[in-house]
Design a protein with these regions (language model features):
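N-terminal signal peptide c-region/cleavage motif recognized by signal peptidases
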Residues: 14-15
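Beta-sheet entry/capping signal
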Residues: 115, 148, 367-368, 389-391, ...
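Substrate-binding clefts and catalytic carboxylate motifs of secreted carbohydrate-active enzymes
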Residues: 28-29, 36-44, 183-186, 489-655, ...
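Extracellular/lumenal ectodomain signal focusing on beta-strand-rich modules
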Residues: 33, 91, 109, 189-190, ...
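Secreted/periplasmic carbohydrate-active enzymes, especially glycoside hydrolases
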Residues: 1-8, 18-368, 372, 590-594, ...
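Aromatic, loop-rich ligand-recognition surfaces of beta-strand-rich domains
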Residues: 698-704, 710-827
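Active-site mouth of glycoside hydrolases
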Residues: 130-134, 158-164, 181, 317-472, ...
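Active-site region of glycoside hydrolase catalytic domains
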Residues: 202, 206, 216-219, 304, ...
Length: 961
């Protein structure tokens, strides 16, 4: 990235030389007064303009439009008032220029086109939201007066994807954001003034290679341009920090000449760096950054200066059995990330707000963000990713529509500018041509060539976001947690090879907390569910999120909600469980064949009820906490599908550890028969199996041979019936007269058979037994089966074969069973409570905790309603405030002083001054469970400005409140 505002490079530059000075002309700078009005007509008045930003956001800020985030206001706006051209006018004084200096006016981007005039003089025409404009205005500014800057912005027009690209493809609405009136037309990127001499430094570029961890090679390229009509001689000086690598290089330029200067270790031996500080993704090491300060001097005077921040790193790319793998600095990277659709649907995320959002991604232990369809162009986003060790999968502005932009030339120019502007960022790992499609000819070849030439081939160009080594897109709806562990969690309609692989999109609806919900939903629309919810995409407008299924699952898992507050509370448990399982399911198969996963979506652009981790107000949902737990670099996890426990190490260091598993009943009593402990050596970048939690101990059918009358490709085959995996299933052909049988190996005695049905269950069936597999006797029959988990008690039986004989299907499909289990039950043996708890711990040699994990499990698949029978929890809360370095921390200790389990405790700090939540914050945990007498310390860290008077309160509330 190239720092522009008051960049200082002092150490080896000539004494007394000032760095390049830049004067920002954004609307918050105080250096200019902006206003905007329609180019023609009086449909709207002139209002103060937000620059950078879109036209519509300026009118919202001016109060002309009601808050478009609230209720259905976004849909009530008369978009015809904004779907037109607008004129921006800015008034600014002339800054001191100095003799022999040139004053430049720079535009970083206008959406979609813009004509620029200064004091009545046309400077140029901008075409595309990443095309820059660089204008010498030295002789055009008023010497001692005010200057009038005008920008005529042409709106985007219809249709948007992909015809109007380069632009914000989702601006006409998507299934996660409304139509943005004006289609985000406006001055959408930075505007500033700068000063230089006759010679300018243009597009400096730092490239790095890492042959091994102890050595790196740095290459510096920069264009040097002589803007004068005379030849000149000068010196290019620079210093790289840390390391103090200083250099100077003489340069002679003819009049008007522009030349590329290339410096390598041959010209500057120090560019062969010993013991470099490498840039690592989050969880693998520190994202070390260097600065390269450049200045060009003529006659002992600085003509221009630039500071480039870069990271020493080298990406690598491999395909194992056709599956994509990413490497950095020679090490494989297991990718854990999220899709970032837009920063904010009206472009109102700016400056330090990017750092806040990217820091939340780092705190979730993510190491990658996908910049979906290149919808974020602000350099502050990339700066934040560099600082926080978040790699970027960076798309260009094409969706899967089989059509080309109307103006291929403008697209190509903007694509080249994007690469050149952003290539110094170490965070960019992949350039991607098209979302879920291959760019239509000639763009695919053009983009591949652009990356090869302007990025030097240092990073991969990937044509399509969900194929060519990737495992598809989706699905985007919630499933039972075990589904993510079983072969294979594939998107609907996927025609490639089934795999976990590298999935660039998979997600689920994620409902907000109640306190966020009430900020954007009118009270009369709170409950019951209604069409207003669909204005925030909980309905048919976001069908891919399956909100109906999500709503039903909350009720099935936790019972019918009695109102919106109860629904939001229960929804957070679904958010946490499913999103944690999504990442843990992939990690369960790490390198076999899973190589990466990115949720759809990690960053909300609009107050939404689907696809997010934290919400629009930066309140972490249950999804955030589930993902944070799953993605920790050293992790212990349980499989919902087969009850196995694994340890996962995505760091670069091996470790010795002890793994412990304990199971507790609903009352918090330890069930010692399930306790297991194992010492383990865990290699770097691996997942290792530890042991199984055998909740089906005594199951005579486990892993026994199975035969069936038929098997449909809808299922995993007959063997799935006894594999102990609650998410693999047998499915029959679509006929009533179907059967499936288990061979127990010999004649066995038993008293109980358990059948776990998928939705396609039997309405009527028989249970039959046989000693020889030919002659069968009936021991159970039903004509009114309801599906789900059915436990069939029997008088003591003896047989070798057990058969389910279908008589009548309950659906149009065949019969489908997850499991058949066969037991001889001792009436006196203790039974698991309907809901019980699993606690896992991983500790180091000294007993220090490396990872812990907590699950709730039901004896009936997905039925957690027994949690509603827990006695109310009694919690004691103590807290203390400290401050340092512009941050404040509320250290909170929550203790369970009651007799019941305190399940899913949510803790939130509030300001006393206005009763509002203190957001955003970072903390270690939330929605945690405390057994009797246990306590948990949580540190809430946040910006000091969020609590200026130090007056706060902390609320802790368990699910069983």
């Amino acid at each position: 990235m190239i720092k522009r505002i008051f960049a200082l490079c002092l150490s080896l530059l000539a004494a007394g030389v000032s760095a390049q000075e830049c004067i920002p002309l954004d609307s918050r700078s105080g250096h200019i007064r902006w206003e905007v009005r329609p180019s023609e007509g009086d449909a709207l008045p002139a209002v103060p303009a937000i620059v950078p930003g879109c036209v519509f956001a300026s009118y919202v800020a001016a109060g002309v439009e009601a808050d478009p985030n609230f209720g259905d206001n976004a849909y009530r706006t008369d978009k015809s008032r904004y779907d037109r051209n607008f004129r921006y006018t800015g008034l600014f004084p002339t800054p001191p220029v100095g003799e022999g200096r040139t004053l430049w006016l720079r535009f970083e981007g206008v959406n979609r086109k813009g004509t620029v005039r200064l004091n009545g003089h046309q400077l140029g025409h901008l075409d595309g939201f990443m095309q820059p404009g660089d204008y010498d205005i030295t002789r055009l500014v008023a010497p001692d007066g005010e200057n009038r800057l005008e920008v005529e912005v042409e709106w985007v027009g219809y249709p948007v994807p992909n015809f109007r690209s380069p632009t914000y493809i989702s601006s006409a609405g998507w299934d996660w954001m409304p139509y943005a009136p004006g289609l985000l037309s406006g001055i959408t990127d930075d505007v500033y003034l700068s000063l230089s001499g006759d010679v300018r430094l243009v597009e400096p570029w730092v490239r790095t290679k890492v042959p091994d961890r102890e050595h790196a090679k740095v290459e510096l390229l920069t264009d040097v341009e002589n803007r004068s009509d005379k030849a000149c001689e000068g010196v290019l000086r620079g210093e790289i920090r840390p390391g103090g690598i200083a250099f100077s290089h003489p340069v002679r330029l003819e009049a008007g000449e522009r030349r590329t200067i290339r410096l390598t270790e041959r010209e500057v031996p120090g560019l062969a760096v010993e013991h470099p500080q490498l840039w690592w993704p989050n969880g693998m090491g520190d994202p070390a950054l260097y600065t390269c300060c450049l200045a060009f001097e003529t006659d002992g005077r600085q003509s221009d200066a630039r500071t480039v921040t870069f990271g020493i790193r080298e990406y690598g790319y491999e395909w194992h059995d056709g599956i994509f793998r990413l490497k950095i600095n020679g090490e494989p990277v297991y990718v854990k990330g999220g899709n970032w659709g837009m920063s904010e649907w009206l472009l109102r995320c700016r400056g330090e707000e990017y750092d806040t959002r990217v820091a939340l991604h780092r705190h979730m232990h993510f190491n990658m963000i996908r910049n979906w369809i290149g919808s974020t162009t602000d350099e502050e986003f990339y700066d934040a990713c560099d600082r926080h060790g978040i790699m970027v999968w960076d798309d260009f502005w094409l969706n899967s529509h089989p059509n080309l932009p109307h103006d291929l030339g403008a697209f190509q120019q903007n694509a080249v500018e994007k690469i050149k502007r952003l290539r110094n960022h170490p965070s960019i790992a992949v350039w991607c041509g098209d979302n879920e499609g291959v760019p239509q000819a000639p763009l695919d070849d053009w983009l591949r060539g652009d990356v090869a030439h302007y990025d030097g081939g240092d990073r991969l160009y990937q044509s399509i976001s969900n194929a060519q080594g990737l495992s598809g897109s989706g699905p985007w709806a919630n499933f039972h947690p075990g589904w993510y562990f079983a072969a294979y969690p594939m998107p609907y309609g996927y025609k490639g090879r089934p795999a976990w692989g590298f999935r660039t999109e998979i997600g689920t609806a994620v409902f907000t907390t109640f306190e966020s919900f009430r900020k954007f939903m009118p009270e009369e629309s709170w409950w019951p569910r209604n069409d207003m919810w669909d204005k925030h995409f909980f309905g048919k407008s976001a069908a891919n999120a399956a909100p109906d299924k999500y709503f039903e699952t909350v009720a099935e898992n936790y019972g019918e909600a009695d109102g919106i507050e109860d629904f939001c509370r229960k929804a957070q448990l679904l958010n946490l469980e499913v999103n944690k399982a999504m990442y843990e399911g992939w990690q369960h198969h790490m390198w076999d064949d899973a190589t990466g996963i990115m949720t759809w979506m990690s960053q909300p652009a609009y107050p939404s009820l689907v696809w997010q981790t934290y919400d629009y107000y930066l309140d972490p949902t249950g999804a955030y906490w589930g993902i944070r737990k799953a993605c920790e670099p050293v992790h212990i996890q349980w499989s919902h599908a087969d009850n196995s426990v694994k340890a996962v190490n995505t760091t670069r260091e091996p470790l010795e550890a002890t793994a412990t598993a304990r199971v507790y009943d609903l009352d918090g009593r330890l069930l010692p028969q399930f306790t297991q402990q194992l010492r383990v050596s865990l290699a770097a970048n691996t997942a290792r199996s530890l042991f199984d939690l055998n909740f089906s101990e005594g199951n005579l059918a486990r892993n026994r041979p199975v035969k069936a009358s038929s098997s449909s490709p809808d299922g995993a085959g007959a063997g799935a019936l006894t594999d102990g995996n609650d998410s693999s299933r047998w499915a029959s052909e679509y006929n009533d007269d179907q059967w499936i049988e288990v061979d127990l190996g010999e004649r066995r005695a038993f008293t109980e058979v358990v059948l776990r049905w998928e939705d396609a269950h039997a309405a009527a069936y028989k249970l039959q037994l046989s000693d020889d597999g030919r002659t069968w006797r009936d021991v159970y029959e039903t004509q009114d089966a309801q599906g789900g988990e059915q436990t069939i008690p029997l008088p003591l039986q003896q047989a070798r074969y057990v058969r389910m004989l279908g008589l009548r299907r309950a659906t149009q499909w065949g019969y489908s069973l997850y499991e058949m289990e066969v037991y001889r039950r001792d009436a006196k043996a203790p039974k698991l409570s309907p809901v019980h708890f699993i606690r896992l711990e991983l500790t180091d040699r000294d007993g220090r905790l490396l990872s812990d994990n907590f699950y709730w499990r039901a004896t009936r698949r997905g039925d957690y309603t027994a949690l509603n029978t827990l006695a109310p929890a009694k919690l004691q809360v103590r807290s203390q405030l400290t401050a340092a370095g512009g941050r404040k921390v509320i250290r909170t200790t929550v203790r369970n002083v009651g007799r019941s389990v305190a399940f899913a405790v949510h803790v939130q700090p509030y300001r006393r001054s206005d009763g509002e939540r203190i957001l955003p914050y970072v903390a270690d945990d939330n929605y945690f469970t405390l057994l009797q007498g246990e306590s948990r310390q949580i540190d809430f860290e946040f910006d000091a400005s969020l609590l200026p008077d130090d007056r706060y309160t902390v609320r802790a509330e368990a699910y069983n409140r």
